[in-house]
Every structure is written in structure tokens, then in C-alpha cells.
Amino acid sequence: ELGVSKDKAESLFQIYHQRVPFVKSLMRSVSNRAQQRGQIRTLLGRLCRFHLWEPNQFGMHKALPFEQAVQEHGPGIKRAYTYKALNKLIQGSAADMTKKCMLDLYKEGIVAHIQVHDELDISVESDKQAKKIVEIMENAVTLEIPNKVDYESGKNWGDINE
């Protein structure tokens, strides 16, 4: 589908994990937490639940609630979809941060017209207000590595995306 051979894909995957080795251990750690606890928490504490179960053996199986999974597959079951835990952590935390930005902006009387993923479309009255918006967004969530906000302006949204 991607026009890359299996060998090339495996090589790229191996190079990636050599260059950023913490990703694999983070992925394993978050997946294990989801498996053991049935949930993970995003950066701001929102719960992402893993409430469905599937058989331990590899294959195509429908994920089921615990009682149904035990009835259908017996005791050899595990939580389903825990391989998605890292993605839920990252995407969920990004969503938390965007929502926190929107809330902080709202408290200052600034309302976004639309949100698209981690992007906000806001009517801005002046350069001073634009700087205030950037400052609010960069400080909405305190992290060890500071947040950076990219700001673009134009007469309309179409002008910005050309």
C-alpha cells in the first residue's frame, strides 16, 4: 500500500527505534499499565478506559465486556486494544491542552470560532491581542519543555492556508 518493501519498512522501523529508544519502553510501559489497571490517565488526569477483553491467543476476535469474554473464551483473556494506549496518552493529552487553552482564552473573553485538532481559529482585533492569545496558550499547561505556539494571521482563513 505504501510502496515500501517489507524489508525496507522493517529497516526504517529499526532505525527509528535506535534513534529514539525511549519510545519503545514508553510504549511498553503505557500498554502494561493499561493491561494491569484497565485505564491510563492523560496529562491533565482524564481517564482513558480499556474495558473490553479478548482471548490471549493471536487472531481475529471481537472484543467483549469481561463477563461475555470469560463465557466465550474462558479464563485465558486479556484486555483488548492496550496497544493503543500510547496513542491515547499522546492524543488525549494534546486534546487536554487544547481544551485548557480554550478555557483560559474564554476566561479572558476570547472565543475561538472553530477548533481543528490542536489548531484554533480566532478573530483578532490587534497585534496586542494576538500576543496576549499566544501568551495565554503557551502558559495554559506548564511542562518541563515550554510550549511553543505558532501564530499566523490573514484577512480570512483561506489566505493563511495558501
Model region roles, listed by residue range:
Residues E1-E162:
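Conserved catalytic core of nucleotide polymerization and phosphodiester-bond processing enzymes
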